[in-house]
């Protein structure tokens, strides 16, 4: 089946699909606070989703392309679930967030199919995969159209990997008590086994969102990157996120001695946002298997336990948390009680001495991750490093921060 036909088959209208912003029914919606964050983007009036320009540009999307798609959404006069929010158009049609981003992805998919240069074709496939992931963002459970966009993203990513430098292997990992999960092992040129970074991504991202991290930072240093999806999304969608947030990643770590391309004696974990919750748990629970753990904007305690902090984050992010926890109809009070159990300090881990070297990078005044959380991580480690990343200029400092983190990881792996 051709890619175009696959797209048509997946998105063929069958019934009235639920609109993304209606999937989580929290009772205590408050006023939307203005938020700006390097890792999560910013709240913009009249948009349900946070607009994450930095990360989308970092993943290879042209800023003008972002504005073009946003303009098509804004200009639509189709029915919306909330007339005050542009990105709530009902149904898979013009103006709908998923429709417009998926349509943009198909443009690049067609370019990829027509391209004779394999490497350039690989770039086009990767571009399409990224756009399909933006279409599916923020990846709420039960969003049928988003899940179809994710399927197309994974397919485009596999096509890209066949054409881009290095090698990617799709791997299946067995997890007792449930369905197996699929991960992607990205390997640089040369002979393995390679030192490897196990990526622990944020709750509003897919494992295929981190190719730029591998290509620009790990591959040039001869380091492989292994990704899996976080519980409840993508290839890990059959697993619910629980207080044992590191369960899937632990089983992957335990399987690495049987993976011939990975040097299981030289493995580090890298956690973005809530992925840092996973990575820090691994530092405590699997310290013999890890040489180092790095975190960026970690969500490990304050946001999970402090009501005032939770009031400062956007509705969309609270919806993502509720969706991952399977609490689609919960009040904010019920959600708050449950989130508290995910705090690594409440769990009795953070604050105890940890033998694993840990680095934590943070931005001042980050509403999702306070400086205190990063200090708690690094002060708990026998070999801790605290890294403050200045906000402006945001892109340059983000790149510089990632370079410093990669240098730190490399010294402990190589």
Swiss-Prot record:
Hydrolase found in the keyword field: yes
Reactions mediated catalytically: a carboxylic ester + H2O = an alcohol + a carboxylate + H(+)
InterPro entries xref list: AB_hydrolase_fold, FrsA, FrsA-like, FrsA_esterase
This protein's UniProt keywords: Hydrolase, Serine esterase
GO terms assigned for molecular function: carboxylesterase activity
Enzyme Commission number, as recorded: 3.1.1.1
Family: Belongs to the FrsA family.
UniProt function note: Catalyzes the hydrolysis of esters.
UniProt protein name: Esterase FrsA
């Amino acid at each position: 089946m051709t890619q175009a036909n696959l797209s048509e088959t997946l998105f063929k209208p069958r019934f009235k699909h639920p609109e993304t912003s209606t999937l989580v029914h929290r009772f205590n919606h408050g006023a939307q606070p203005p938020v700006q964050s390097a890792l999560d983007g910013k709240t913009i009036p009249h948009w349900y989703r946070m607009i994450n320009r930095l990360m989308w540009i970092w993943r290879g999307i042209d800023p003008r392309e972002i504005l073009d798609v946003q303009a098509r959404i804004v200009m639509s006069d189709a029915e919306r679930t909330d007339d005050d929010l542009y990105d709530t158009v009902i149904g898979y049609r013009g103006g709908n967030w998923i429709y417009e981003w998926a349509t943009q992805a198909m443009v690049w998919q067609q370019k990829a199919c027509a391209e004779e240069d394999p490497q350039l074709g690989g770039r086009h496939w990767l571009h399409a995969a990224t756009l399909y992931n933006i279409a599916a963002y923020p990846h709420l459970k039960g969003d049928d159209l988003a899940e179809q966009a994710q399927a197309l993203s994974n397919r485009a990513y596999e096509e890209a990997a066949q054409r881009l430098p290095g090698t990617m292997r799709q791997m299946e990992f067995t997890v007792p008590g449930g369905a197996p999960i699929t991960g992607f092992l990205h390997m640089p040129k040369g002979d393995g086994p390679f030192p490897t970074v196990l990526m622990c991504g944020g709750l509003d991202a897919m494992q295929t969102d981190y190719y730029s991290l591998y290509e620009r930072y790990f591959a040039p240093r001869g380091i492989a990157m292994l990704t899996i999806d976080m519980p409840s999304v993508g290839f890990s969608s059959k697993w619910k996120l629980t207080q044992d947030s590191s369960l899937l990643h632990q089983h992957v770590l335990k399987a690495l001695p049987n993976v011939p391309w990975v040097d299981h004696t030289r493995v580090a974990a890298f956690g973005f946002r809530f992925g840092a919750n996973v990575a820090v748990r691994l530092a405590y629970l699997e310290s013999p298997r890890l040489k180092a753990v790095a975190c960026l904007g970690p969500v490990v305690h304050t946001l999970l336990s402090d009501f005032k902090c939770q009031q400062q984050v956007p509705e969309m992010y609270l919806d993502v948390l509720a969706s991952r926890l399977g609490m689609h109809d919960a009040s904010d009070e019920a959600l708050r009680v449950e989130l508290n159990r995910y705090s690594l300090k409440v769990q009795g881990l953070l604050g105890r001495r940890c033998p694993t070297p840990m680095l934590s990078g943070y931005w001042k005044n980050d509403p999702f991750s306070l400086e205190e959380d990063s200090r708690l991580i690094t002060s708990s480690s026998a070999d801790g490093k605290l890294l403050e990343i200045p906000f402006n200029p945001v892109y340059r400092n983000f790149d510089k921060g990632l370079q410093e983190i990669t240098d730190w990881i490399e010294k402990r792996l190589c």
